[in-house]
């Protein structure tokens, strides 16, 4: 970050090295999704499900009064089981980060796009992390951050954030959840 120059007064960011790139994709997508949801709600839209590049944000329930039923994609693309879980959501967001959509393979080893800032290599703690939370921007940031943390660290963060819940898909395919996650599981 020493070559990133932020000028708050001028509201600019300058990258000293012309080969550098700054990708705010996930956070920007989550923020934009949340802005659209709030604007629609302010305009009187009571029932809508937004899906913006995998960020899902519900405004209210479905028109029939039932919650929205959403599958969480199985990161094991070879599996016949397409979803690892199904949730009922109402007025909140569901965002997942994982190693299964943006990746490349070199000599049989798959490298994904979520880089661990400590190792500067793709994070290897999980196959996927899904976050249920009231704000899509925060959900996006949390799913990426927690993907880069050991389970206990991520669980501690989620448990201390009121209203946030998480599902972790471990490398062996097993699932772990935060304490309040069960309330969202489809009945």
Feature names for model-found ranges:
Residues 1-187:
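Mature catalytic core of soluble alpha/beta enzymes
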């Amino acid at each position: 970050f020493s070559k990133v120059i932020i000028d708050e007064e001028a509201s600019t960011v300058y990258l000293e090295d012309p080969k550098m790139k700054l990708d705010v994709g996930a956070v920007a997508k989550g923020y934009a999704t949340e802005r659209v949801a709030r604007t629609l709600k302010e305009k009187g839209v009571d029932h809508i499900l937004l899906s913006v590049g995998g960020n899902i944000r519900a405004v209210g329930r479905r028109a029939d009064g039932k919650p929205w039923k959403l599958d969480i994609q199985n990161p094991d693309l070879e599996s016949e089981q397409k979803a690892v879980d199904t949730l009922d959501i109402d007025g909140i967001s569901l965002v997942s980060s994982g190693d299964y959509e943006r990746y490349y393979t070199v000599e049989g080893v798959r490298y994904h796009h979520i880089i661990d800032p400590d190792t500067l290599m793709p994070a290897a703690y999980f196959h996927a992390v899904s976050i249920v939370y009231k704000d899509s921007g925060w959900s996006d940031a949390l799913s990426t951050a927690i993907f880069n943390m050991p389970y206990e660290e991520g669980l501690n963060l989620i448990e201390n954030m009121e209203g946030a819940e998480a599902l972790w898909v471990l490398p062996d395919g097993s699932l772990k959840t935060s304490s309040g996650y069960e309330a969202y599981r489809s009945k």
